[in-house]
Amino acid sequence: MLLTPSFELPPRAARTLISLCLSWAFCQSSVGLAQGKSDPSSGAVAAAVRDGAHDFDFGAGTWHTHIKRTLDPFDDKSPSMELDGSVSSRKVWGGRAWLEEIQADGPKGHWQAMTLFLYNPQAHQWSMNFINSKMGTLNSPLIGEFKDGHGDLFQQDTFKDRAILVRGRWSNITADAHTYEESYSDDGGKTWKTAFMARKTRVPASEIRPVQETPNDFDFHVGTWKLHTARLLKPLSGATQWTEADGTVVFKKIWDGSANLSEIHTDYPTGAVDFLALRWYNPVARQWFLSFATAADGQLGTAMAGQFKDGRIDFYDQEPFNGKAILVRFSMWHGAKGQPVSEQAFSADGGKTWETNFRTDYTRVSSN
């Protein structure tokens, strides 16, 4: 049994079963999300903890961005490059998550990226998850919070083979402008060197141009769908008892179709479950990747990879399950009536045999 009545998230493979099978748009099975917890030692302190779930509300809309990037922030003589472009930001989960699409032009041509901001209600912190369209890889998140009118998120990284700290800061926030600055520190945060500066000004609604859409692998799935799931209660145990549930999926394009985000809501007898599924294409590997987040802990899990062949896509991953390493396969295709179907299976013998433990059927509600 991987889905507990209280909906506490079980181990990685257990969360995989919950998430992957709730939506055809969701193929993540490698989770292990760190869950922050507030300090219960003082009722007064806990009561005073600030709810930052709407910290990024200022970013809603479309913005012009002017970017300056310093190639080596630790070298005072380092060259820099400048880019101009646009940023479109919209809220998800009523503001507990935000999706930011970025495109800009500079000396090296056109550049696209996206950022998914997720709020952790236990830790009262935000995570910033960034993907560059040219590389198609998900960076480790910056994590932090807003205080005194600005937001600081931090991450440990390497620069020229040296360990550094990275700080992302939002400041100078008004209704029509704000600044994002990314700085590096090689002395434990005593001093910071600016590596990236983006100054954003709001674009009036009358000047916003519609995005030109292009065909991609998942264009058919754009829209709203009803889902019906059937789940095996005890995988890899010889059990044959299944349970069923219904829900909805709202699927939207990003980057004109080379990435997408789906919002998943499923109703179980013991309560509702909400997920986000973020999927993007890696043009170098020619593979699709997908990761998910739950409303409970507001962090993205590790992504699976897969690719289409003959109208079907199969994603594979290795996961711990009941103390043993297993293989997880998640597949998507079109059924007899042309509607999407997804299926998850586990293998305990290295892929020689597979046991299906989840199936989802979808019915279109609307195409937008």
Each predicted region: which residue ranges?
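N-terminal secretory signal peptides that target proteins for export/translocation
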Residues: 1-12
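Sec/Tat signal peptide C-region and signal peptidase I cleavage site
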Residues: 30-34
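Hydrophobic small-molecule pocket/channel-lining residues, especially in calycin-type beta-barrels
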Residues: 35-368
